[in-house]
């Protein structure tokens, strides 16, 4: 299960999506999320799903990597679907009414839409991290949040912290897997027993994991100090961010997506 968590990983490539400016990809992620929450019917959901599918195909990221990253979310998706099925009250007679629990057609439709929305939302986030290196992501975030410097917001530090946290997710997952394998070799059992027994079994994992995380953080801080890192003031960049033609074309496609979903919502198509 731990090995299926792929958030924060970067897959090097030379596709159009990889070569987009990181600011473009961040803005397009926001645009896509807005379009996703504006979608209210089958046609609009099909449109945003097709848009993401085409983007994944263009990026040359294997679809199995996206699907593998979804495995740890199965319980959340099932829980979300069940809640919407049983707690949505519709009009007319229920489809099923057993022991006081009624299931309406509206509940089934809402459950499908909510699960699909979560899947598309997570998949679009995966696509961003898969096609954007942590350094590029940091530069893009810092550039987009640059206006906040006028109100003394530590933009560079915030973007750096977010990207380091994202980058360390795969590292901590790998470390957790190693610790679990070592504990299993010593006879630890993480699968049987009650919930309390499973919770107690996690203690031998969490303690060395926290120690490892602090050690890695200290090593990272030492490495940054040795390279004379002193924050974002006066820093120059090896690769300057510049918008290119395909970035503006991508913005135009994003605007068309928002407009199309808005039209579908207004006219109920």
Task: Indicate residue ranges for each PLM-predicted region.
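Membrane-interface helix-boundary signature
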Residues: 44, 63, 70, 106-109, ...
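Transmembrane alpha-helix interface motif
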Residues: 1-42, 48-57, 143-153, 157-160, ...
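Juxtamembrane/interface alpha-helical elements of multi-pass membrane proteins
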Residues: 70-188
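Alpha-helical transmembrane segments and their helix-start/interface "positive-inside/aromatic belt" motifs
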Residues: 25, 64-75, 250
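Transmembrane helix-loop junctions in multipass membrane proteins, especially transporters and channels
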Residues: 41, 45, 60-64, 88-97, ...
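Alpha-helical transmembrane segments and their membrane-interface exit regions
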Residues: 51-61, 75-79
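Membrane-helix interfacial "entry" motifs
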Residues: 14, 37, 60-65, 98, ...
């Amino acid at each position: 299960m731990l090995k299926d968590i792929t958030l924060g990983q970067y897959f090097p490539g030379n596709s159009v999506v990889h070569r987009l400016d990181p600011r473009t990809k961040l803005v397009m992620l926001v645009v896509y999320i807005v379009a996703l929450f504006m979608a209210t019917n089958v046609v609009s959901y099909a449109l945003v799903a097709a848009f993401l599918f085409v983007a994944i195909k263009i990026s040359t990221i294997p679809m199995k990597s996206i699907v593998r990253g979804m495995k740890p979310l199965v319980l959340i998706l099932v829980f979300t679907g069940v809640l919407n099925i049983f707690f949505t009250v519709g009009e007319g007679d229920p489809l099923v009414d057993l022991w006081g629990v009624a299931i309406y057609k509206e509940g089934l439709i809402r459950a499908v839409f909510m699960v699909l929305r979560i899947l598309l939302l997570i998949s679009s986030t995966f696509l961003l991290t898969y096609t954007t290196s942590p350094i590029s992501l940091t530069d893009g975030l810092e550039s987009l949040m640059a206006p906040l410097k006028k109100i003394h917001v530590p933009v560079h530090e915030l973007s750096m912290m977010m990207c380091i946290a994202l980058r360390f997710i795969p590292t901590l997952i790998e470390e957790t897997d190693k610790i679990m394998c070592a504990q299993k070799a010593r006879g630890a059992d993480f699968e049987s027993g009650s919930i309390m027994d499973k919770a107690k079994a996690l203690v031998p994992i969490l303690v060395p994991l926290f120690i490892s995380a602090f050690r890695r953080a200290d090593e990272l801080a030492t490495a940054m100090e040795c390279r004379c890192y002193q924050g974002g003031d006066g820093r120059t960049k090896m690769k300057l961010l510049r918008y290119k033609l395909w970035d503006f074309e991508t913005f135009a496609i994003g605007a068309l997506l928002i407009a199309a979903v808005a039209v579908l919502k207004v006219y109920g198509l």
